[in-house]
From Swiss-Prot:
One of its GO terms (molecular function) is NADH dehydrogenase (ubiquinone) activity. This is NAD(P)H-quinone oxidoreductase subunit I, chloroplastic. Binds 2 [4Fe-4S] clusters per subunit. It is an enzyme of class 7 (translocase).
Length: 180
């Protein structure tokens, strides 16, 4: 009869322990009810990209000297640089520059090693199309500046309203390179 009593006592202790664990999990769950949701509704809300985000590449035709360093440092030899040698000025003349973003891995080596800084990474990441051939950007498409997420009034950014009001007041007085 003694083992039966100890069995009931251990059963009671296990029940109390299980009740305590369930209570702790309920408290943890209820403590998260005041939090904002982490998931964003992508087409209508966009997260703000970090300062050094590696998005679409921006190209400045006038700065390029056709040295082809970007092609040499690219792991997949992606940029296509067409040039001709001008004998009268003894320099390369850039004719065409293109990048296929369907193949690009956005490593940023071309931007990092460009001696004239004619390449830069933008915050634009929406490059989806129905035809993969539309992702082959020439120098005209590459020189197009991206629409800033902060300036687009149709999109809500993921920030607290008081924080975004302070930032709007600061940004109305001065514009940075990322505010196009």
């Amino acid at each position: 009869m003694f083992p039966m009593v100890t069995g009931f006592m251990s059963y009671g202790q296990q029940t109390i322990r299980a009740t305590r664990y369930i209570g702790q999990s309920f408290i943890t769950t209820l403590s998260h009810t005041n939090r904002l949701p982490i998931t964003i509704h992508y087409p209508y809300e966009k997260s703000i990209t970090p300062e050094r985000f590696r998005g679409r590449i921006h190209f400045e035709f006038d700065k390029c000297i056709a040295c082809e360093v970007c092609v040499r440092v690219c792991p997949i030899d992606l940029p296509v640089v067409d040039w001709r040698f001008e004998k009268d000025i003894k320099r390369k003349q850039l004719l065409n520059y293109s990048i296929d973003f369907g193949v690009c891995i956005f490593c940023g080596n071309c931007v990092e090693y460009c001696p004239t800084s004619c390449l830069s990474m933008t915050e634009e990441y929406e490059l989806s199309t129905y035809d993969r051939h539309e992702l082959n950007y020439n120098q005209i498409a590459l020189s197009r500046l991206p629409i800033s997420i902060m300036g687009d009034y149709t999109i809500q950014t993921i920030r607290n309203s008081s924080e975004s009001k302070i930032n709007k007041e600061k940004s109305s007085n001065s514009r940075t390179i990322t505010d196009y």
